[in-house]
Amino acid sequence: VVLTSMFEEQILADVNKLEFESSAKAHPEEIDYLRQMGMSQKSDEYLKVIEKSKEAVDIPVIASVNCISDSSWTDYAKYIEAVGADALELNIALMPKDPKEDPKDIEKRIYKIIEVVKHNINIPVAAKIGPYFTSMTRVAEGMRKSGASGLVLFNRFYQPDIDIDTFEFQSKNRYSSPGEMSHSLRSVAILFETFGGSLIGNSGIHDGEAVVKQLLAGASAVELCSTLYINGLGQIEIMLSFLEKWMRKNGYRDIDEFRGKISQKNALQPEYFERQQYIRALVGVD
């Protein structure tokens, strides 16, 4: 089970509030103390969640942090490991806004976050990322070399909308839809041959059929969220039942017998993952 992410911005907001409420004439040592205390209060709450989760279930518990820098997690990753987390998911959600920022520098920031965290812990580290990279295969290779044992494809970013009466931004599409799964399905199928680690399908996986598709593409596992809010926790059993029936119907005893069967490497029509199929779909060129 993957726990909800703790956001770096939440911690920093609490820290900044403590600093603001302190005396403007406070000594630097006091500011440092307040910063550490703010980090401690928020992080302690999350560590307790990990401990309680480990006590409640007998399956692996994966902690998750939503981070935008490497500076806040050097020591905290050790605490996450110490309280019993079986793995750590780095939910890396960078939204570049500066046109002067080199894309390579953005990639280096991601690699640095992974390197710093992995250097301090022994449990597996997975990177949860968005789909917006020029070369996903190259970025995936860089994250693997930086220490990521797995990739979660993909992070689902905030979906904004505009209220034309109040002239304000508002949230839209809080939950994913089944149609969103195609993003991860394609990348999982392409990366299956080259990544060399675990690939986790995410976003838009709402039923058992979607699970089968992800496994056929090459996924090691899938993450579920929206479908559980919409349909309840009983949806897990329904999806597993579908998977088991599908395996019996097709003569499979083990998931590894068909995992990656329709990846780009093994597909009978690998061009479905390439530009030629895009042209064919639009203009009917064979």
Explain the meaning of each model-derived region.
Residues N231-N250, D256-D286:
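C-terminal extensions of enzymes
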Residues A219, S226, L243-M247:
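Short leucine-rich amphipathic alpha-helical surface patches
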Residues E223-T227, N231-G232:
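Helical hairpin unit composed of two closely spaced alpha helices linked by a short loop
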Residues R35, I62, P99, L228, ...:
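Generic anion/oxyanion-binding catalytic loop in active/binding sites
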Residues L3-P28, Q41-I62, N66-N202, H206-L224, ...:
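Alpha/beta enzyme core
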